[in-house]
Regions:
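Active-site nucleophile/metal-coordination loop of metallo-enzymes that catalyze phosphate/sulfate
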Residues: 1-155, 163, 167
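Acidic/histidine-rich
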Residues: 170
Length: 170
């Protein structure tokens, strides 16, 4: 809590470094986004509304890419779940709009906290939400990768692995 994270969230050095010397608690972006999802304020975000509205108006597909895990430091699987919920608010089917999800799975931050949950667990969560919202013809998991290959700091030292991710996503 002292570094701006929710009480249930374990911090890391990133959060400590961000708050050293501030003399006050400042919520992290993670805490801010989760707070907006929980309060439903997330669903009136004008930028997100414009993305979906413009996609319907122009009959263009939407691609959503990001880290999907319960690690909580770099991302949260609830971001994707909320975006699926947001998609349900728009008439994507009539417009012929497809929402393509590109979750990047994260075993690194998650395995120490919840060892029984792996990437398949999070993909199933997404699939279940898509089905619950009746979006199985509109929203799909287009592809996935692991964080280690495309996002880690040392990926630059593993150019072949990073290049595979680039090719898969392009």
């Amino acid at each position: 809590d002292a570094v701006g994270l929710p009480d249930y969230q374990m911090g890391d050095s990133d959060n400590g470094h961000r708050t050293i010397g501030l003399g006050k608690i400042t919520p992290t972006l993670y805490a801010h986004i989760i707070g907006q999802i929980e309060s439903k304020e997330f669903f009136s975000n004008s930028i997100l509304e414009e993305v979906f509205t413009k996609a319907v108006r122009e009959k263009r597909n939407i691609n959503i890419m990001g880290l999907c895990s319960a690690g909580g430091i770099h991302a949260d699987n609830r971001y994707f779940l909320a975006l699926i919920d947001m998609a349900a608010r728009f008439d994507l089917t009539s417009a012929g709009v497809q929402v393509n999800l590109w979750p990047i799975l994260d075993g690194r931050d998650v395995m120490t906290r919840v060892p029984y949950q792996n990437g398949i667990y999070y993909l199933r969560q997404l699939e279940e939400r898509i089905i619950e919202r009746g979006l199985f013809n509109v929203v799909r998991i287009a592809g996935t990768s692991g964080r280690q290959f495309g996002m880690d700091r040392d990926a630059i030292n593993r150019e072949d692995e990073a290049a595979n991710i680039d090719r898969a996503l392009a």
